[in-house]
């Protein structure tokens, strides 16, 4: 088995972490909005910022895996 395929597979695992993180954040945002509906605008803006940061991790993993597959 080629080592770059193994390395690319491990780099893609960052997407799993991002998915779990966004799922937990979504659950927290929904629960917070249900408890305090008047703060939904602030909760939504914080959630979008957090989801974007979490998704950046998945994008970095994807870019690294593509580089490992096609460049190295």
Swiss-Prot record:
GO terms for cellular component: plasma membrane; proton-transporting ATP synthase complex; proton-transporting two-sector ATPase complex, proton-transporting domain. Pfam families: ATP-synt_C. The chain crosses the membrane at residues 5-25, 52-72. The record marks 55 as: Reversibly protonated during proton transport. GO terms for molecular function: lipid binding; proton-transporting ATP synthase activity, rotational mechanism. It is a multi-pass membrane protein. Belongs to the ATPase C chain family. F-type ATPases have 2 components, F(1) - the catalytic core - and F(0) - the membrane proton channel. F(1) has five subunits: alpha(3), beta(3), gamma(1), delta(1), epsilon(1). F(0) has three main subunits: a(1), b(2) and c(10-14). The alpha and beta chains form an alternating ring which encloses part of the gamma chain. F(1) is attached to F(0) by a central stalk formed by the gamma and epsilon chains, while a peripheral stalk is formed by the delta and b chains. This is ATP synthase subunit c. It comes from Clostridium perfringens (strain SM101 / Type A). The lineage of its organism: Bacteria, Bacillati, Bacillota, Clostridia, Eubacteriales.
């Amino acid at each position: 088995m080629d080592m770059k395929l193994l390395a690319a597979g491990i780099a893609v695992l960052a997407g799993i972490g991002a998915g779990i993180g966004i799922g937990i954040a979504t659950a927290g945002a929904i629960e917070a909005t249900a408890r305090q509906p008047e703060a939904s605008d602030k909760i939504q803006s914080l959630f979008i910022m957090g989801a974007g940061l979490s998704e950046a991790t998945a994008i970095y993993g994807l870019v690294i895996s593509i580089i490992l597959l096609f460049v190295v």
